[in-house]
Amino acid sequence: MASTSQLSYRSNLNFSYSALFSLGFRPFFLLAAVFAVVLMLIWALELRGITFANYYPSILWHSHELIFGFTTAVISGFLLTAVGNWTGKVMLHGHGLAALVLLWFAGRTLPFLPVEPLVVAVVDLAFYPLLIAAITKPILQNGKMKNMVFVIFCGLMALMNLLVHLDVLNIAPNMAHLGIYGALNVVVLVMLIIGGRVIPFFSERAIPDYKGRSITVVEKLVLPVAVITFLNDLWQPLALWAYGLSGLLALLLLLRVGSWFDRRLLSNPLLWVLHGGYLMIALGFLLRALLPWLQLSPFIYIHALTVGGIGLLTLGMMSRVALGHTGRPLKLPQVMHLAFYCLLVALVCRVLVLAWIQKPFLYDMSAMFWMLAFGLFVLTYIPALVSPRADKG
């Protein structure tokens, strides 16, 4: 079975509707990666002056779709799979899952079609309530109420999305900014919590006599400080103490990811990509803390969080989950090593270089390497995601 279970871009495509919609990670991870490519291609064309009729203003579409399109698809796929593991309950699957996926897809395509703006808003806003319904029932049946935190996060995402649409519809002007930044903070907080759960766990399972050890005081402080920092960013983002809070959070995150470090993880791409993504979140808040002194654009720290933090963590988690949950060994396909490095190049071009060198070709380079990274994921993982498990039959 090892020979057939080893995944590569040359693997046979054995499409099965029942397999594709058996668990949430399969369709959502696949579409998230496809959309990551499409999203960045459209944005690169927009930056070059090739515009498209859109329900959203151009820059708002870019930020909204990164968070409520791409990242939401990844989080949905993760939760619709992980909640089943945590609770032992059967999760949304089959036609019900297909309908939820179709709703997400409609939210991505309707903004470009000649339909009433209210229809676009209603369709896009319907997604999170249905996702909440899908994950709440098994959590309540299981009784482990600590997992209800993810229901709360989904509710906050729904609220932030509502603010964006109320602004676009001119019902509540000037609220889109709050909705986008609020949603980004929620996403980062979700990543901090999930990363804090799984990164040390994955590392300990993969590395014999793992040397990483959590620091108790850091573990107790990091999430409360993160919540305070994010709430303050919605209230007084330009106050001096806001930069101080970002600096404190960056320090705690650096200590946290440093406490997990074992140099042997550098030889395991499925581990270093997750540690690296967490480190990029720390870097993002460090850059945020230094903005007044470095005289940098706020977009520098935002893209450290999105391209670096969200990009690396989502690509790393999708790559790992899609192996383990399709019955394959946790051995990263060789081409995905290249995908991870492409994402690092995209990060360097968009964050580190553009901080000091404002050259249009660097935007193109960043977009190209982002698209290459997620395009390689699609080409490599589509056989696994649309086919029955490799260890069945």
What kind of region is each of these model predictions?
Residues 1-393:
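Hydrophobic alpha-helical transmembrane segments of multi-pass integral membrane proteins
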